[in-house]
Amino acid sequence: MTLTDAPARPRPRDAGGASPMSLWRLLWLELRRNAMPWMFPLLAALFVFDPFRTAMGYGPFWDLRASVLENKLLPDFVLFVAGVAAWMGSRDSRRHTRDLVDATARPRWTAQLTTWAATTLWVAAGFLCCVAVLYGVTASQATWGGPPWWPVAVSLAELALLSALGFAAGTFFPSRFTAPLAALGAFLLCLEGFRNAVGRSSVYALLSPTTYVPDDDTGLFHHYLPDVSIAQLMFLIGLTLVVLAALALPRAADAGPRLRRAAAVIAVAGLAAAGTAIGLTGTARTQAYGTVIPVLHDGANDRPIPYTRVCGQAAGVPVCVHPAYRSFLPAMTAALVPVLRQIASLPGAPARVDQVVVNDLIPSNGAAIAGVPPVFRLPVPATPDETSFGQNASTFRNSLQSTLVTLFVVGADGFVFMGPPGGSPAQQAVELALLQKAGTAIQTGGGPGNAHAKAEQVATAARRFAALPAATRHAWLAAQLAALRAGRITLAQLP
């Protein structure tokens, strides 16, 4: 029999447990002896080069930047948390000592929970330091809203679960290889969960924190819906309780009847919480501004967030955006001025430019020129300077101009992607001419055979139309715009 198999020192049945002060001293001792702080330099480097760098590429919007906590920072922590927790769980067996068994008058299960708590506290401290840096920088840049805490709570709950799983693996399978295997297993589990959950709406996908990717303007026009976050917390905390209760099962845990009954109650409560979360998530439905779980949903979150628009002027036309996009306004007005000057006073020219919600589930909120007087309704991407789509400031400017010109010439009244000109050949030629005079470099689509020849004809007509004096172009558009929009103008009829 090895030293670690030896039963804990028996306690008199009438003796009381150790005082809370002794438990605090044990926790302090475990905090000092924990291996997690040695991982912080590596985690700090990962934070700077992955989550923080990604977040700084987004606009200064709280919910959008907070998304990196769950889909970037959390996966970076997974490997280290599971590995260190397994290392701490197998520490006593690897050393073949009884020092921790004799160091406390409490049952071994209590000592194990204290070691796990110390590891988890260090993990939480490191994670919250990263959150503080990210939120601190965002607070110095954001002009609207405040920090979202639901992603932080869900991330901490998942880290606690991973710590419990790693610690249990180290306790039940003590070996020098347990820690690296636990780290690898946690990483593969996270990777597989992300692969199977992204783009799906199943219960598994909704309960996976690493799949959270919000819309660009989440938390700006409408409230963040915490329904799924609440279900995730119930699920993760429930599983954590089950894993910790399982540590009381072995005889070496020295858990008497009372502690075993307490562990059983904890396990049942954890299973109930996890099962309830799964059941509630099964009733979830996707709405325009988030996922709703009826039992957990607060109807007050369905109301739009009131705000006062911030406006600028582009060629005498008001350009209004959400206050959070205040820093984007100069770039937007500068991009729209050369186009609005060319189409001023023409039929259908916008009298105002308004920002609308970026949401693929609401087609009516796409780019359009509609209303009386006409209003250019424009969804603005959250990252005009540098986006995940590779969009830079020049591309953002060209996209705004191309979208406005296409909507004006084609007369579209619905969703239009920011992109190259569309419509009939004559419409494309007019669009290219207007964009050329605005300083936008747009190429016509080419191709083999007839397609290439047609593109050359469009480009030639566009150059011919752009070479006209501004007054002549304006007068022709004023007289022929209705026929052009109806598709009755051919390339040969363009002046």
Per-segment meaning from a language model:
Residues 41, 176-191:
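Pore- or pathway-lining transmembrane helices of multi-pass membrane proteins that form conduits
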Residues 100-109:
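Short helix-to-coil transition segments within interhelical loops
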Residues 123-170, 411-456, 463-487, 493:
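Alpha-helical transmembrane segments and their short interhelical loops
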Residues 187-252:
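Membrane-embedded alpha-helical segments of integral membrane proteins
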Residues 1-85, 91-92, 242-287, 293-320, ...:
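Hydrophobic alpha-helical transmembrane segments
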Residues 33, 170-179, 253-254:
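Membrane-helix interface "capping/anchor" motifs
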